[in-house]
Every structure is written in C-alpha cells, then in structure tokens.
Amino acid sequence: MKAVHFGAGNIGRGFVGLLLHQAGYELVFADVAEELISQLAAADSYDVHEVGDNPTVRTVDNFRALNSATQEADVVAEIATADVVTTAVGPHILKFVAPVIAKGIAARAAGLAPLQVMACENAINATDILRDEVAAQWDPAAGPLEAVAVFANTAVDRIVPNQEPGKGLDVTVETFYEWVIDRTPFGDNVPVIPGATFVDNLEPYIERKLFTVNTGHAAAAYFGFEAGLSKISEAMADQDVAADVRAVLDETKELLIHKHGFNREEQEAYVEKILGRFTNPHLPDTVNRVGRAPLRKLSRHERFIGPAAELAERGIVPEALLGAIAAALRFNDPADAEAAELAQIVASSTAAEATEKVTGLTPGHPLFAAVEALVEEVKAEVKA
C-alpha cells in the first residue's frame, strides 16, 4: 500500500504521516518547502515524541519526499500508483495542490481501484473543497472523476505546537489524537487505517471537534493574550481565563447536545478531556500561535461566529462566545498579518461595515447587533 501526503510540516509528520506509517503504508511526502523536503529526502527516519501522562517515542521510516513544485512529474507518477492521497496544508492551500492531484489521477492506469482522497484540515468538509478544486482541473474527456477517485471528508484532532529550534525532523505532539473519516463514499473498499475511526455521519463529529477543541483552544489564546500570558498552559492555569474558556464550551456544549443529540454525560466528559489537554505543561504552545489568523477564525462558519450565530437563531444570547469574539477582535499580535489586517478593517470602517466584512453576518441576523456593539467598543478603545 502507498500513500502520498501533501504537507510535510509538523502535523503531516507528527499526525497523519505517523498514522499512515503505522497502518503499513509506504509514505511519500510532498511539499514546496525545499529545505524541509531536502532534510526528509536525506533522512532514513524521524521520531514523534508524544508527551503527556504516558510519554512515548514513535519512529517513522519507509518514506520518500518530493518537492511538488520542482518535482511535479515525480509527484504525479507517485499518485498514479498510490492507494491513498491525504493533505495537511491548510484549507486555503488546497487549490494549489489540486492541479497536481488531478494530473496524478489522470495518469492512473485503467483497472486500478479508485484513488482514495482525504483532506485532513481544520475546516468543515475540507475534502469537498479539494474535490471541487480537482474537478475544476479535470478533463471531462477522461471520463467521470468519481469513477477514478473517491473523496471522503474527515475530522482531525491533535495538538501539534511549533517545534523548538534545532530538533530537526523530530516532532513533539500530545498523546491524544482523533481522526474520524466518513465511511460512506468508500462503499465496501474502506481504507485500512487502524488509527482512524470510520463513521456513517461525519457532521456531528466535525462540529463537535470544531466547536469544542478549536473554539476552546482559540478562546484560551485570545483570553490569555488579553491577560498578558504567553503559553496556553499558563493561560489555563489562570483562574479567570480558565473560567471564561469553560463558559464558552458550556455554550457550545448545549448547542451540540440539542443539535446533534449527543449524550449529555458523554459530551460533558468530552469537554473535560479537551480542557485537560489545554493544560498540558509538556506542550510549549503559545497564545500567539494558537491565536494567529484571527480573520479566518472570526469568519462566518468558523469556531466563534458559527456556534454563536446558531445559538442566537435559537433565541439564546451567547454571552461567553461574545466575550471570546471581543477578545479575538483585540488580538493585536504585531507579527500576525491577519491581526494587522483586522485592526485596519476595524479602524477604517464603521462598526456595521466591519462586522459584516469580518464575520459575514448580515445586518438582519439576530447576532449582528451584539457583535456590532463589540466592534464599536474596540473602535473606541483604539481612539482613546
């Protein structure tokens, strides 16, 4: 079995690549970072250090590495004979890897089983995004795309912080992970990935992860940044920050229980597990890293506005989520390009204009006025 994985960064090596290796796949990493690809190509193996209550070191070998920009033909050839293609590149980069994937699918010999494609990104239905981008590159004369490739959405969860300098290819990750995959597109030919969980209805798991892990993690970052703290574990050790994060997750918990029918005790236990992960002192994760890209995180269907809007539509005022949104609006990390752009939008627009532009909410939405009031507060603070 062979898997081609796009994105040889920390998540690619420390999560998706590791699980594919453990499943017995021959692994081909594809990336455009030349230094990283050169290091991988020259290495026989790398180690994944799982830190937490039961620390473990896992070694990954039997891999190759290719530069998908300068060695495109080689990547196409690998896809042409692969069983699985995965990505961990970021949702906005999927459109750039799609042309290579399309060429690889087109190069597959007749009679091969359909290529199994899964985007492992922090976005809802990321594989649908990738499928649409591949379809846009597909030549209809080659026949229907769905006859030669199967696209399945996934929900992925593992905290992989920025790595300390000088560690080379080794990656430090938390012990917890979750890779949930939609079983239905595969029919009787489900991929062999023992570390993954296959389900018939993925949406509840995607939203549970996004509205608990991603919402809570980012809330800890923004509240922690406001409190002048540097690490996520330090933020969660602060009683006020921890209480604010818990209040946010109490709101999303209620939404998830009522929307998807999760068992209350199981969902409460899930929240406790997630909060425990954020306090892991062995993960050197910073509020700046977790809080980066606030424009994306404040967008319409993301971790804050998404659940807050649904609660507002149900007649519930999401006070804690609004507090997190306010903290995100104040995230002014000078090293973050999106933070600078967010500040510029808030400063140069009316509160209503900024609310609509940043969040995608329309003025008639039941959440709009509350967010507009927060933007007005932030504008006043900047002027003061």
UniProtKB/Swiss-Prot annotation:
GO terms for molecular function: mannitol-1-phosphate 5-dehydrogenase activity. The gene is mtlD. This is Mannitol-1-phosphate 5-dehydrogenase. It comes from the Bacteria. GO terms for cellular component: cytosol. GO terms for biological process: mannitol catabolic process. SUPFAM superfamilies: 6-phosphogluconate dehydrogenase C-terminal domain-like, NAD(P)-binding Rossmann-fold domains. Its EC number is 1.1.1.17. Belongs to the mannitol dehydrogenase family. NAD(+) binds at A3, V4, H5, F6, G7, A8, G9, N10, I11, G12, R13, G14. Keywords: NAD, Oxidoreductase. NCBIfam families: PRK02318.1-2, PRK02318.2-5. InterPro entries: 6-PGluconate_DH-like_C_sf, 6PGD_dom2, Mannitol_1_phos_5_DH, Mannitol_DH, Mannitol_DH_C, Mannitol_DH_N, NAD(P)-bd_dom_sf. It is an enzyme of class 1 (oxidoreductase). Coiled coil: none annotated. It catalyses: D-mannitol 1-phosphate + NAD(+) = beta-D-fructose 6-phosphate + NADH + H(+). The keyword Kinase does not apply.
